[in-house]
């Protein structure tokens, strides 16, 4: 079983979320547990994607779309998940985290390696590399993004954060 999904059950049942408060903590816990994803992973992803900046906006040239809000969700991705609102509304933290966690859950279920799912959240569908026996980013680089998220995860769950 996917350890991120298993970790979510433990975190949501035992309320072992964060050692210190983080921005949007209750919202992250609520939406992550609803999607059955570890709140810690969602928080690490938000720290990586937007640095907890609810107004973050980035133009994605390769797909001609904007990534917005805490989880840097693209309008096209949100629409794929059933979103019908405006770009402005998608930046609202509760809306952004709701659609971001839904998309992350899809990625984690689709890819057998947790970190491949994390990479898929950021890069879109990764490519399978038979030589490495794992997924790689579309541009051929190793999964540096997953390492960044993992580093943020360690930071937000350590007492010195």
PLM features: residue spans?
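Sec-dependent signal peptide recognition
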Residues: 1-8
């Amino acid at each position: 079983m996917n350890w991120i999904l298993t970790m979510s059950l433990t975190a949501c049942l035992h309320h072992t979320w964060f050692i210190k408060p983080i921005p949007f903590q209750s919202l992250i816990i609520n939406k992550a547990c609803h999607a059955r994803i570890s709140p810690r992973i969602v928080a690490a992803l938000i720290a990586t994607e937007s640095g907890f900046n609810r107004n973050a906006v980035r133009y994605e040239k390769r797909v001609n779309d904007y990534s917005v809000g805490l989880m840097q969700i693209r309008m096209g991705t949100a629409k794929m998940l059933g979103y019908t609102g405006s770009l402005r509304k998608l930046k609202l933290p509760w809306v952004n985290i709701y659609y971001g966690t839904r998309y992350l859950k899809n990625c984690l279920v689709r890819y057998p390696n947790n970190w491949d799912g994390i990479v898929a959240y950021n890069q879109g569908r990764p490519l399978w590399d038979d030589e490495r026996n794992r997924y790689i980013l579309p541009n051929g680089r190793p999964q540096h993004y997953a390492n960044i998220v993992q580093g943020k995860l360690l930071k937000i769950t350590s007492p010195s954060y």
